[in-house]
C-alpha cells in the first residue's frame, strides 16, 4: 500500500510540475522570451526585474523550488536542453549566464556575473557594477552550497564539489572533479 501511495504522489508531483511549467512558459513567452518544450517547475521562480526578451530556455528544463532570477536590463540567462536546477538557487545576471545541456545545479547555489567596484573615492553602494559572463559547459555538475562568481568558466563534464567557490581565475579542465576553497582538482571523470 505504501508503494502505491508513493507512486500516486510521484505522479501528482510530476503533473503539477508540468502544469506550472506550462504557466511559466506562457508568462515568459508574453515577455518575448524563448522557451522550448517540456519545461517543468516545482514552484514559480521569483523574478527581480521583468523578463524582457532576455531568458532563453531549451527543451526539458527542470526548475526546483524557491529559485530567484535577478535580471538587469542588459542581462541574459540561457539554459540549454535538459538543464536541472534544484532548489534555493540565486542567479544574478548583469551580463550573460549560460548553463550547458545536461548540466545540473544543486541546492543553495549562488551564480553571480557581477560585482561592485571598490574605489575608495566614492561610497561603495554608489559605485557602478562590473560584470563578466559566466559559462557552465555541458554535462557539468555544481554541488550544494557553491558560489560561482563573474567570469567563471566551468568546462564540459566538470563537477564542482559542495561549498566551493569558482572565480574567473580558476582553470577548470574538461571532466575534472574539483572541490575546496581555493578550488583544487581532486580527480578526473573516467
Model regions and ranges:
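Conserved catalytic-core motifs of eukaryotic protein kinase domains, centered on the activation segment
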Residues: 115-116, 121-122, 170-171, 189
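Flexible glycine-rich beta->alpha loop in the catalytic core of nucleotide-sugar glycosyltransferases
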Residues: 109, 116, 153, 164-165, ...
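Alpha-helix termini
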Residues: 71-72, 129, 164
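A generic "structured core" feature
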Residues: 147-149, 155, 159, 165-167
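Domain-scale signature associated with acetyltransferase and cell-envelope carbohydrate enzymes
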Residues: 1-112, 133-139, 146-148, 156, ...
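Glycine-rich NAD(P)-binding loop of Rossmann-like domains
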Residues: 123-137
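Flexible, gly/pro- and Lys/Arg-enriched active-site loops
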Residues: 114-115, 127
